[in-house]
Design a protein with these regions (language model features):
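Compact integral membrane and secretory-pathway proteins
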Residues: 1-156
Length: 156
């Protein structure tokens, strides 16, 4: 007894192919910046006496950035693969989702950058490369969607 022969009417599985060309310039900047931000969270953000700590270790609230970054990357990747898009009937548009998410990430990363860990006895804490990479990546991810809004509010 074996398995039945495949029927001639069987539908072939659709091929899932990541199409980078389907992404516009804004999506590439938002997605690329967010991917670099995600990676930077695991890099050394602060150093003290030769020891370094990651952004996630120094500031637990950066786990929010980690989760939001995964959501942004997932949304853009799902659209590039063609498996899912934000429904047109949604009350919030795709761009609104990305604006809120990238702005939240930027604000939290800026706060983490400015609030170096320390306190009593830790006056020598300095920034390390991960903090700069993370801040620049958060700016790159938020800028393409945020700048037009800023310009419109200024009346330009």
């Amino acid at each position: 007894m074996g398995s039945p022969p495949p029927s001639s009417g069987a539908q072939p599985k659709p091929q899932i192919k990541f199409d980078l060309a389907s992404l516009g310039r804004v999506d590439r900047l938002v997605g690329g910046g967010t991917l670099v931000l995600f990676i930077s969270l695991f890099l050394t953000w602060f150093s003290y006496a030769g020891f370094g700590i990651s952004g996630l270790t120094a500031h637990g609230y950066l786990y929010i950035v980690l989760i939001v970054a995964l959501g942004i990357i997932g949304l853009i990747a799902a659209e590039a693969v063609g498996v899912w898009k934000v429904p047109e009937s949604s009350t919030i548009s795709r761009d609104q989702i990305l604006i809120v998410a990238t702005a939240l990430n930027f604000v939290l990363v800026l706060i983490a950058f400015l609030l170096k860990p320390g306190g009593y006895g830790f006056h020598g804490v300095g920034w390390s490369y991960g903090a700069f990479v993370g801040l620049i990546a958060a700016i790159v991810a938020a800028f393409p969607l945020g700048w037009p809004i800023i310009q419109a509010r200024r009346g330009k």
